[in-house]
């Protein structure tokens, strides 16, 4: 992994709760959008936008288990403007709704 990839990833990790564009990510490594895409694909086998989506979903999963915040609030905290889209993407990634995920993992912790 090169320094430019690390710079882009650090930016995503720091600002994932905000509205981030491919241009914002590319600017962090002082590269064009197409170069940012190529670097991500080469070293991370992913696109910056998809990496951001996965990171947001992973952070939301952590918040579901470690806080009692409502799903809508968590969705907003991790950068989703639309809770329905958040729930759809969460279910696609984790194969269950955010509420089901919370119930499963909180119950698991009580066993």
Report residues per predicted region:
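C-terminal interaction modules of eukaryotic adaptor/scaffold proteins
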Residues: 91, 102
